[in-house]
Amino acid sequence: MKTPTDQRFDYVKIGLASPERIRQWGERTLPNGQVVGEVTKPETINYRTLKPEMDGLFCEKIFGPSKDWECWCGKYKRVRHRGIVCERCGVEVTESRVRRHRMGFIKLAAPVTHVWYLKGIPSYLSILLDMPLRDVEQIVYFNAYVVLDPGNAGNLSYKQLLSEDQWLEIEEEIYAEDSELVGIEVGIGAEAIQRLLQEINLEEEAERLRTEIVESKGQKRAKLIKRLRVIDNFIATGSQAEWMVLSVIPVIPPDLRPMVQLDGGRFATSDLNDLYRRVINRNNRLSRLQEILAPEIIVRNEKRMLQEAVDALIDNGRRGRTVVGANNRALKSLSDIIEGKQGRFRQNLLGKRVDYSGRSVIVVGPKLKIYQCGLPREMAIELFQPFVIHRLIKLGIVNNIKAAKKMIQRGDANVWHVLDEVITGHPVMLNRAPTLHRLGIQAFEPILVEGRAIQLHPLVCPAFNADFDGDQMAVHIPLSLEAQSEARLLMLACHNILSPATGRPIVAPSQDMVLGCYYLTAENPKAQKGGGRYFASMDDAIRAFDQGLVDLHASVWLRLPVGEKVKTNKPDEEVLETETLPDGSIWKYYRERKTREKDGEIISQYVRTTVGRIIYNKTILEALVV
């Protein structure tokens, strides 16, 4: 049967849920017509039988059976009883995996505010009520009264805050024999906030604000725009303002807050169970106090404690004292589970592990081409294993997959030859987190290398914002031919020379490369070894350096072809000295070069340089010619 979860979806939208919607999440009608879903007891499991308590946080009637196709009392076992509701325990016989998605709810004896909307930045409750956050907090946590209806009292105004003493004085005036005060209403706690929110007509308020914004300026205008934006968002999403005050709390499925038995008979439980237990205990106590008509001060204190328990459940530590468990460790609330790097979204939903991917430390690979990366053999054989197996079978080296896997495990020589064939022309994608722009993922042609580190060309580092101080990168293999061609045509590093954000080159030499270029071309008068020598070609000079006959920075003379023009840093046209040879030719000495001329024609020329500059020039020349 196709369930709604089988359907594909494009995005997840988080919004306010109405009390009716929360009840719908948790309320279910069993095949026998019984309606279940409300969690009324704080118990989890029975300490003797180790079975979930009925109507508790792990109730099988509400959330489904703990064991596949078995009811709580054990009357029905086996799959043939599918869909039957046990007459004794009321548990529906079904799969235990339903406990991963079936929810419950807690009906609160008094409404409470949602701490995200009260203490968030900005505080939507204070913006919507147009009251300072401190005043709203005083009302919610039973420190001050708020005027809901001033009646005919001239000294009272709508939404005015009153202390306990002020309200007692007004009460005495109201109940005096000669009192003319009528219609005065005050409130306290989340009930008062709920009443104020219900009295706001969002459409009318939005129109009034638009009119005021036109006439206002400065700080007041900015405040009005802020409030209008919040109201418009409420209207656009179809949410009611009073939904920010909760009268029903959802209980997440029990398998998402499990209780696990440890060695020695002890139990490890999710922190959420403790937080839910606090809410249920306080809620049940408040219900009993209301039933026996307890004094208002006691009821009010219990309502405040219920508000604090729900705050801790939703976001522990956001307001007031943090609820702690054993060893003074703060309990993880619903917000803690969702938010942050280790939260449900970033860790589990966005950060899923995928097949055909690997991860390793990056090191510099200066001998690579810009479109190449060094892939460790150990990683490559694992990532390309299906391709290698297919190729081994196709070549007739092995007959089946099992034999191919054994051959790979042995490290047979044939495997490495086949791997070389497979990776030729098969690009891989390298990604460095955080992927802040599209150049955070680029394609490269893999080159097999020894060791366990991925080699990266230094020129692509700025695009990845990578350095070699321990950074790690992920490797992904495009599988289909379409993905491979897309990676080759669009994502190959040599096609991503310019930054898509600025249009400027993002591939530019930096750090080690600039230092290396400087070192090669620098002059050092102290480098005397081999200084003043003559070399017929660049290769001769480099060979002499390799043999240790000349220093890298020693000043030497290099013979150049006659037609080649020599450019120097400073003007070098002035002849410093001339020398006439017996054959009639003339040596002309300049600052950085010298030429031999006969009959007005140059027959040979030399330039003063260093071996480092020769190496630099030769490298650049070869790169340009190729």
From Swiss-Prot:
Keywords: DNA-directed RNA polymerase, Magnesium, Metal-binding, Nucleotidyltransferase, Transcription, Transferase, Zinc. One of its GO terms (biological process) is DNA-templated transcription. GO terms for molecular function: DNA binding; DNA-directed RNA polymerase activity; magnesium ion binding; zinc ion binding. It catalyses: RNA(n) + a ribonucleoside 5'-triphosphate = RNA(n+1) + diphosphate. Zn(2+) binds at C71, C73, C86, C89. Its EC number is 2.7.7.6. Binds 1 Mg(2+) ion per subunit. GO terms for cellular component: DNA-directed RNA polymerase complex. Mg(2+) binds at D467, D469, D471. In cyanobacteria the RNAP catalytic core is composed of 2 alpha, 1 beta, 1 beta', 1 gamma and 1 omega subunit. When a sigma factor is associated with the core the holoenzyme is formed, which can initiate transcription. Belongs to the RNA polymerase beta' chain family. RpoC1 subfamily. This is DNA-directed RNA polymerase subunit gamma. It comes from Microcystis aeruginosa (strain NIES-843 / IAM M-2473). The gene is rpoC1.
